[in-house]
Amino acid sequence: VEVAQAIAEKLGLELVVDDMGFDAALTAVQTGQSDMAMAGITVNDDRLKVMDFSDSYATGVQVVIVKEGSSIQTVDDLANAKMIGTQKGTTGYIYCSAPVEEDGYGEDHVTGYDSGALAVMALMNDQVDAVVIDNEPAKAFVEANEGLKILDTEFAVEDYAIGVDKGNTQLLDAINGALKELIADGTVQSIVGKYITAE
């Protein structure tokens, strides 16, 4: 929200925030309900078919949370998990639910939850064997819940960008122009550093 606010100020526009779930945010842009979507969105081929993306403003890291003492000790061990928890619509969900021949684990081995917190709760209650989620929320969940740990190996590294309706080049160009200035003067880095790892 703070990056969006900084962009709006650069463009002389008023920011109206409509807080919604991840999938809903993507749909809202496609249907014209929202001008742009910012929710830790990463660019992938499926999303590029239905929306356009700004230049990247940060790099995110997906990690794996397990219970201490779990038989899952490395990312490779995820292949042996009976069930993996993720947040619906996120990159972790997309990667994990992809067919095995596409390096995923298949939809039968993945449960998508409405939030990362619900996925972690499912892990605590032994409904899933592991949770794949962004690094920063993962650290907060592990800190708040005794008996959880993050695997040493990263699951995936990805670029975050802002989604706009396909073909809205005027808005996209304006956002990219503002982002360029905000990255150059350090504004984006100082905001992003509070929330996600941006290397």
State where each predicted segment sits:
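Periplasmic-binding protein-like
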Residues: 59-66, 135, 139-180, 196-199
